[in-house]
């Protein structure tokens, strides 16, 4: 019950923080665009991690009710943590920091795509932007996420390398299931100034997925 209450309180705080900035977006954006986008993105990534923690806690409690100590997964025995009643605040802060740090990179990338790729046929320009985004930014973005989390969690080089080797390609494949369609819509219908916000709103689901993968009991990190 404590984990549920903690996560609900955390979600409410992040939601209020997010909508506070949304309500003042235009004024804040004109004064400090990158900081405004960064704080919005930080609140969204924090929400994503809280969602992931809630799902993770629910799964562990569900399995613990069926089996007291361990569960069988992919042919291996995985020991469950002694308790799931504690909200990992430091983990949520790490994800908020990740969102804040990613924003200026993401924003400048979208601006560069818009400025560099200009053709007489708008559809071709959009397709080229999506292609560059998915074949350049997406692979590097996943590397940035793994490195950021590994460094902020003080993981050793060997464990980080092992995690890369095990999880990079599956994560990149999962990226290609979701993001090409999202970015096609984003670059077609969303104004440039709002493209980062739209991508980050959709990214709540993606970041929750990454958070679950990064914190899974059998992760080599």
From Swiss-Prot:
Residue ranges crossing the lipid bilayer per the database entry: 2-22, 34-54, 97-117, 131-151, 177-197
Transmembrane as UniProt keyword: yes
One GO CC annotation: mitochondrial inner membrane
Superkingdom of origin organism: Eukaryota
Entry-linked InterPro entries: Mpv17_PMP22
Name of the protein: Uncharacterized protein C4G9.14
Intracellular or extracellular location(s): Membrane
Gene source species: Schizosaccharomyces pombe (strain 972 / ATCC 24843)
Keyword Metal-binding applies: no
Membrane topology: Multi-pass membrane protein
Pfam family, one: Mpv17_PMP22
Family affiliation: Belongs to the peroxisomal membrane protein PXMP2/4 family.
Keywords, sorted A to Z: Membrane, Transmembrane, Transmembrane helix
Predominant location: membrane
């Amino acid at each position: 019950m404590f984990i549920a209450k903690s996560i609900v309180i955390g979600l409410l705080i992040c939601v209020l923080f997010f909508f506070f900035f949304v309500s003042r977006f235009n004024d804040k954006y004109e004064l400090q665009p990158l900081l405004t986008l960064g704080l919005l993105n930080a609140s969204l990534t924090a929400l994503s991690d809280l969602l992931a923690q809630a799902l993770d806690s629910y799964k562990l409690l569900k399995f613990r009710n069926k089996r007291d100590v361990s569960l069988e997964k992919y042919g291996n025995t995985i020991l469950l943590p002694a308790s799931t009643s504690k909200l990992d605040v430091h983990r949520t802060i790490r994800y908020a920091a990740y969102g804040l740090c990613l924003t200026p990179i993401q924003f400048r990338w979208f601006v560069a795509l818009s400025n560099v790729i200009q053709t007489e046929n708008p559809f071709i320009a959009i397709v080229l932007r999506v292609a560059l985004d998915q074949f350049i930014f997406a692979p590097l973005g996943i590397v940035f996420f793994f490195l950021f989390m590994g460094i902020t969690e003080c993981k050793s080089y060997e464990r980080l390398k092992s995690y890369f080797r095990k999880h990079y390609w599956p994560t990149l494949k999962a990226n290609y299931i979701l993001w090409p369609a999202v970015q096609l819509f984003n670059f077609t219908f969303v104004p440039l100034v709002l493209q980062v916000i739209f991508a980050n709103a959709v990214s709540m689901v993606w970041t929750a997925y990454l958070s679950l993968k990064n914190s899974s009991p059998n992760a080599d990190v």
